[in-house]
Amino acid sequence: MRAFAMSMGIDPQAFVRQMKEPIARSSIIYYPPQFSELGRKQFGVAPHTDYGCLTLLWQDQVGGLEVQNHQGEWVTAHPIEGTLVVNVGDLLMRWSNDVFRSTPHRVINRQSCERYSMLVAWDPDFDTLIDPSIVCADQESALYPPIRCGEYVLSRFDGSFSYRN
């Protein structure tokens, strides 16, 4: 998070100091082997953006992660052994006033073998005010209104899992 702040020319601790008690989530995801042609709408993980601040993703060598470029095309994100994929989430996009953009991505396992991935997502403290004006010259140039981290994350979580109700 320090590197993000430094690249924007703001206090290197601007984001870090808001992560004393961060909201963190982790997942291990299993994708079964595919032995037949996939339909156009069949996904391991449907197209989405990460709603939090920052996600670190490890994927095995099977592949299947695709990201959407600015032209709307899906591009394969080939696994590179010994590396992690760093995803900017929607919350960091808001906080940075769109300096950093969250990228739509999806997973389609087209292989006849199992696929695994692991992720860890970090967000600031629950009560942190996500205010893009910290990177703006003035409040009027902020693209988003301030919002509390926990309120935002819970609203996105509820939206994603609305079928629970």
Model feature map: region roles:
Residues 1-165:
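C-terminal flanking tails of non-heme Fe-dependent oxygenases
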